[in-house]
């Protein structure tokens, strides 16, 4: 599973999403079945993330060092 996405459209929520920024994607099979993604956005008040249309993001692969910097080593 790809754990990171990049915002490619923030028209519907510019306060919570920054165009071109990398966001952590959380697993949510039910949301994905409806073409939605659960994402930790700029608000960060909801630790379980918010749902956004998948069309607002593009999946990306990051090097291990970048993943560790974003979520910590596990």
What are these language model-derived features?
Residues 2-56:
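Basic/aromatic-rich interaction segments and small domains that mediate binding to polyanionic partners
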Residues 45-74:
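Intrinsically disordered, low-complexity, charged/polar segments
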